[in-house]
Every structure is written in structure tokens, then in C-alpha cells.
From Swiss-Prot:
Stretches of the chain forming a coiled coil according to its record: none
Protein name: Cytochrome c'
Subunit description: Monomer.
Signal sequence interval, chain numbering: 1-21
Organism annotation: Rhodopseudomonas palustris (strain ATCC BAA-98 / CGA009)
Length: 146
């Protein structure tokens, strides 16, 4: 009887650890996605004419986007489809290769943009590849906000 209770207690503890780990990965990816969103804000302000072009800020933002894009695919394991507050659509796991490829393309676009953006004109001419990759992922793999 004591062995049975100990076994059940152990399974409950293991199960709760799984739930916490699952929630942790969701929290991690949400934090990185928020960080990426924050990195785009100064660029968007420059594009709208709300802020003066600042190459150092653009470079820092693009570096953050490239770096974060490389981390994100690992933060969408199959066991994180449910169990937390997430806007991730099931399509992510149905077409994980395409999803992961979009992050690779985003990282490549951000890295390439770092090499080509030197002023306001080149920002406007070259940022589309970065922002387009963001949009593709949001359109296909993120639940729409209501």
C-alpha cells in the first residue's frame, strides 16, 4: 500500500514537472517574440518619420532579430502545442519544416540587411525582406487577435 501511494505521488510530481516545463518553453518563446517585437519598434518609427535614422539602432535591432530567429524553432517542441496562454496555431506542428524555414529566412534577411542598410534610403529599400518574413509567419502560424 505504501509503495502504491509513493508511486502515485511520484507520478503526480513528474506530471506537474512536465506541465511546468511545457509552460516554461511557452514563456521563453513569448519573451523572445516580445523582444523581437521591441526590436522592430525603432525601425518602424524611422520608417514612419517619427524618429531620425540611426544606423547604430538599426544594426542593434537587426542583430537582435537575427539572433532571436535562430533560437525560436527549438522553443516550439511538439509537447508545447497546448497547456499555456499562446497564440501559436496547430499549423506550426503540422508544417514544422516550413515554420522553421521562415525563421531561417528571417535570420538571413536580418543579417543581409545589416550589411546593406547604411542610411534612410537603404533602410527603406532593404527592410522589406525582414518585415515580410515577420508578416509571413504571423499570417500563417499565429492566431489572430480578437
Amino acid at each position: 500500500m505504501k509503495l502504491r501511494i509513493a508511486t502515485i505521488a511520484g507520478l503526480v510530481v513528474l506530471g506537474s514537472g512536465f506541465a511546468v516545463a511545457q509552460t516554461d518553453v511557452i514563456a521563453q518563446r513569448k519573451a523572445i517574440l516580445k523582444q523581437m517585437g521591441e526590436a522592430t519598434k525603432p525601425i518602424a518609427a524611422m520608417l514612419k518619420g517619427e524618429a531620425k535614422f540611426d544606423q547604430a539602432v538599426v544594426q542593434k535591432s537587426l542583430a537582435a532579430i537575427a539572433d532571436d530567429s535562430k533560437k525560436l524553432p527549438a522553443l516550439f517542441p511538439a509537447d508545447s502545442k497546448t497547456g499555456g496562454d499562446t497564440a501559436a496555431l496547430p499549423k506550426i506542428w503540422e508544417d514544422k519544416a516550413k515554420f522553421d524555414d521562415l525563421f531561417a529566412k528571417l535570420a538571413a534577411a536580418a543579417t543581409a540587411a545589416q550589411g546593406t542598410i547604411k542610411d534612410e534610403a537603404s533602410l527603406k529599400a532593404n527592410i522589406g525582406g525582414v518585415l515580410g518574413n515577420c508578416k509571413s509567419c504571423h499570417d500563417d502560424f499565429r492566431a489572430k487577435k480578437s
